[in-house]
Amino acid sequence: MDYKTELQGDKIIVYLDGEIDLDKTDAARQSIMDSLEKSNKIFVNLNAVKYIDSSGVSVLIDAQQKANEMEKEFYLQSPSDAVMSVLKMAKLDVFFKISN
């Protein structure tokens, strides 16, 4: 998994790319949590994510809960079909704010 962050106006976009599985969740978690400290509006772009397992989904849930605690806006942006199917299967498509 690769990632990069980009500041666009008042929001930070975290771009995740590749596979988010148990071996790669630490990097995903760190990049998202760092962004929560720096901005009130965070978008996690999942357009280029080809695979996500339960540990990757857990990172997203933890980030959403942390954003709620910090009263910050947290969005999943343009989730790939692979990500969206996992979110729907777990009924998490209604838990997250999803932006296309």
Q: Where in the sequence are the language-model features?
A:
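STAS-typified acidic loop motif
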Residues: 4-29
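Amphipathic alpha-helical interaction surfaces in cytosolic regulatory modules
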Residues: 22-95
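Short acidic-hydrophobic, aromatic-tinged amphipathic segments that line or gate anion-handling sites
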Residues: 97-100
